[in-house]
Amino acid sequence: MKRVQMFLAGAFIAVGSLYAQSSDAEWQAGVAKLKETIQTNPAQAAEEAEHLIKGKNKKNVELLVAIGDAYLNADKIPEAQEYAALARKANGKSALASVLEGNIAVKQKNAGLASQKYEEAIYFDPKCTEAYLKYADIYKSANASLAIEKLNQLKDLEPSNTAVDKKLAEIYYLKNDFNKAVEAYANFAMGPTATEEDLVKYAFALFLNHDFDKSLEVANMGLQKNARHAAFNRLAMYNYTCLLYTSDAADD
């Protein structure tokens, strides 16, 4: 009898999980469609958004925030604020709602409020990755040390998250701290998430650190992807020249 009960309980949990996944997929498809309708037919988009949050989804914070994000990305700030307020009403301690509020503040060029909201999101959920990254974005130029401190907190929580390394590399590069920039780039630049710009900056930082062999390797990697890229070609030439010079100097 116990085995039967355990089997039934397991089956019930599995069915519940499948239903939740199906329900999520349904509203996610609705939000994807909404993103297009917002631009082409705002009135219809408003109706679709209201339909999405009917019934059981009325307090679905993830959905409410997704709709708010869709409006915000379309520069519809009042509508984004409306859905941020609904998300906050559904869950007063939602990190997702705080991030949306922070994103709205960024759009309004209110850096102080945005940073406050991202801090709030981290308070509600210390593992809210987006809040750390967005906070660092606000302070990367105005207060790089504060941005780096926040990113290192996230790095402690998520050591293998290359998005953190990418942001750290960007900030160290802006600060002209090329030693630290090289360390950060090394954690992701040779992988699939690196852009051409990342590779150019990595190669240039290595060049400025006089690591000509590695800089040439990175530049050549960039040239394999884009043989006509001016910066990669220049860096390759600079590195060949420096390597030749140091080789000749050693021979003398």
Predicted regions and their residues:
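Position-specific recognition of the canonical hydrophobic site in helix A of tetratricopeptide repeat
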Residues: 38, 72, 99, 106, ...
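Structural signature of tandem alpha-helical TPR/SEL1-like repeats
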Residues: 41-44, 75-83, 108-117, 142-150, ...
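Conserved structural position within tetratricopeptide repeats
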Residues: 53-55, 85-89, 120-123, 153-156, ...
